[in-house]
Amino acid sequence: DNPRSRDERPLPKVFLRTLLFATSKRGCVVESMHVALSRNETQQNFNIWVYGDERLVRGSGLFVGETGIAVNHHFLTPQDGSSFRFTEGRYRMDVFAQLLGDRDRTLLFSQTLEISREIAAQLAEPDYGLYFDWGPDSSRYLPHVDKRPPLPNAAFLELLNLARRSQSRSRARVKR
């Protein structure tokens, strides 16, 4: 996730791509979703829900039909949860949905994930992210860390844009 300002670290984020489906012919509407992440006695809710593939939409309701919908889900911590950091340990991730018309939330699934000391040290550095991919032979999610490439400098991008405009004008003059 990008920081909200240049001086801030990015907020912790949980990203999932999942297929949701309804067992009824009429389908259902997901009013909201959130992730509850717990380690030992610490629990953090990731209650800011954003979803979509091409265009992200802040959790505003999602129709789920009988054939299902596969979509990317991003869960962020609220501003008051910004002190949360991923550290070494065993985590339980619970994904909940609030369905239209239901009084109680529904637990969609729960997964245990492990973060080693080495991975936790890497995550303390800026621009690193942790990914879990399914290992079919081990029947568990396996972690790996990746560093996000740096964002281009805004001034450099503006110069590049000016150079492209200049080249376009030169080509237009030559074609006359």
Give short role names for the model-derived ranges.
Residues F46-E88, F96-R105:
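Extended, solvent-exposed segments with strong compositional bias
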Residues Q79-Y131:
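Terminal connector regions
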Residues R4-V35, G65-T77, R140, D146-L157:
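Contiguous beta-strand segments within globular domains
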Residues E31-W49, D94-A97:
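Extended low-complexity, serine/threonine- and proline-enriched intrinsically disordered segments
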Residues L20-S24, L37-E41, T77, A97-G101, ...:
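Beta-strand elements of well-folded, non-transmembrane domains
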Residues N40-T42, E54-G65, I115-D127:
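Short, surface-exposed linear segments at secondary-structure transitions and domain or protein termini
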Residues Q111-R176:
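Acidic, serine/threonine- and proline-rich intrinsically disordered appendage/tail regions
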